[in-house]
């Protein structure tokens, strides 16, 4: 056997073993291992191995992007029943953005599994954020095709959803959403907002709102609209609760 073929065979054996260990780590065994390998195959690797029937991960990335948006949207819709469409959209965007996907990929050492061309390898492609985010999406696409939506949901329940529950994305929420997220995480009870007062002429109205948790006042706020007053009340409540933590 020529040395080059021997080296390539040894390389592929090493990666197959790595993929086996990876599947054991995540507790999922692919029915079609080719899909798993394709998810981690960068176009630069395909370009350097044209004689072999390799496919890059770009189509899987396209599919995974859509599956990720759907599953995260469903999770947020169920978890935050009173959150507005705008806030849900903003929160979802923070979860599926490149830095977040890179964080998820790094947590599972995706970079070490990527099949790269020599040029991409030499320029640090294994650690390039855009590449890692693409691989994470491609993996979700491959997992969906191989196992279905339920398995994707189970995987995200282990890797992504706990970070939402831990407040990793609270910074993109408005005050009311942050307060709701904090209370839900703590399991403390129900939040209610009450407008205590309306004053001033019709063209310059001022509202005073109070937010309560299990009938205990947490904060007061005022504003030119009911929404603004509630936001300010939530901001005061958040400040108090965080001081107690």
Swiss-Prot record:
It holds the Pfam family dsrm. Its EC number is 3.1.26.3. GO terms for molecular function: double-stranded RNA binding; metal ion binding; ribonuclease III activity; rRNA binding. Residues 19-148 form the RNase III domain. Its cofactor is Mg(2+). The active site is at residues 65, 137. Belongs to the ribonuclease III family. HAMAP family: RNase_III. This is Ribonuclease 3.
């Amino acid at each position: 056997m020529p040395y080059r073929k021997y080296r390539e065979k040894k390389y592929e054996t090493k990666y197959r073993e790595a993929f086996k260990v990876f599947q054991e780590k995540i507790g999922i065994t692919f029915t079609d291992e080719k899909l798993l390998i394709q998810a981690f195959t960068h176009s630069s690797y395909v370009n350097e191995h044209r004689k072999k029937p390799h496919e890059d991960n770009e189509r899987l990335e396209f599919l995974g992007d859509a599956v990720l948006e759907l599953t995260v949207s469903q999770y947020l819709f169920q978890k935050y029943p009173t959150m507005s469409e705008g806030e849900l959209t903003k929160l979802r965007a923070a979860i599926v953005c490149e830095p977040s996907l890179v964080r998820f990929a790094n947590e599972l050492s995706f970079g070490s599994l990527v099949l790269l061309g020599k040029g991409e390898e030499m320029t640090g492609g294994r650690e390039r954020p855009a590449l890692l985010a693409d691989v994470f999406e491609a993996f979700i696409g491959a997992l969906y095709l191989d196992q279905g939506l339920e398995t994707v949901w189970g995987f995200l329940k282990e890797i992504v959803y706990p970070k939402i529950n831990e407040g990793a994305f609270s910074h993109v929420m408005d005050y009311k959403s942050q307060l709701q997220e904090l209370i839900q995480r703590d399991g403390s009870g129900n939040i209610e907002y009450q407008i205590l007062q309306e004053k001033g002429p019709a063209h310059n109205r001022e509202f005073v709102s109070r937010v309560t948790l299990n009938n205990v006042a947490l904060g007061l706020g005022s504003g030119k609209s009911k929404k603004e007053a509630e936001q300010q009340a939530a901001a005061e409540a958040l400040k108090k609760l965080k001081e107690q933590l």
